[in-house]
Amino acid sequence: MKKNIQRWIPAAVVPVVIATAAIAVPAVANASPSLPEKSPQQLLELVADSAGTPFSGTITQTTALGLPDVSSLAPTAGGDSASSALELITGSHTARVFVGGATTQRVQVLDGFAERDAIRNGDDLWLYDSDAKEATHVTAPADGLPDAPAVTPGEAAAKLLAAVDTSTTVEVVDTARVAGRSAYELRLTPRDADTLVGSVVLSVDAETGVPLGVAVTAKGQSDPAFSVRFSKISFDTPDANLFDFTPASDVTVEEESVDPAKTPDAAAIATPKPTVVGDGWDAVVVFPAGVPLTDPMIDQLTTKVDGGRVLATSLVSAYLADDGRVLVGAVTPEALQAVAAQ
């Protein structure tokens, strides 16, 4: 993908941290509301039934993985992808989200006076960077467009709930006020002893079932390691004009198209796919050797070990092997090295 797309869907280690580790919850300032009792199964069904609910709102992401805040650092030459990915998992970020339906969504990430937009409207996907004055327009059938990263609490919750199985204890633990709404709090606790994840808490809107916040807390910690929550939300259907995008005359536009019926070339067919070792919360994703990770920031954030380099955080670890493989999981670096040695 081109570099402005990579600012949204980077192709290195860090996006897997977001996808694998998932996301966080709010501290509740208001008194807990009194709500009718619901079982975990009833709440899971409520969340599932909320898919496609129109809404708009402001979300705040806060990360405390033990990494330095790199948001003020300029991307290094040739390192836009890694630098932008690292920005997303350090410090705090604010975004505005608009969902009109299954094929109309807009996410607007605010970076000071600049913004990055991802706008999907049917068969059209626009990726816009106001600072770089660049936009990419992708056209494809709705089911042929690439999946967006897990940005909102709902998207993060969907990934987590899809993975709920016998490796997880699920319980309703409390009620809360989130973005002015009454919510149930559903806690997922891993049974796997080797995972770094202590618990995950979902804040579920009591009326609509839309997830308002998701929180992941690492073992041995009391505060979430990664959090995203709504500070404002409205369930009025957003104006259709919000999903129309016309770039300004000074914006460089790159046109791309995706044809699902097109036969992939030999190189695409031969591209090795990631594999998963183990299952449950201590599963490890192994990415085969690919393009070398050369961004100097990678060296700043990793530690040299036998056979490669490791990125260790409170919630997730990555092992960059000298042979080009990348291993990621919510486990210790030593566990990743053991998998790499198999």
Give the predicted meaning of each segment.
Residues 1-15:
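N-terminal export and membrane-targeting signals
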Residues 2-6, 21-132, 171, 185, ...:
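N-terminal mature ectodomain segment of secretory-pathway/periplasmic proteins
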Residues 34-49, 62-64, 69-78, 147-152, ...:
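N-terminal low-complexity, Pro/Thr-rich disordered segments
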Residues 108, 171-251:
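Gly/Pro-enriched, hydrophobic low-complexity segments
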Residues 126-136, 215-227, 231-244, 326-342:
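A short, surface-exposed interaction/processing loop segment used at functional sites
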Residues 130-154:
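Acidic/charged, solvent-exposed loop-and-adjacent secondary-structure segments enriched in E/D, K/R, S/T
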Residues 141-142, 189, 218, 333:
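A generic structural motif
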Residues 242-325, 330-341:
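Accessory, solvent-exposed terminal regions and/or long lumenal/extracellular loops of proteins
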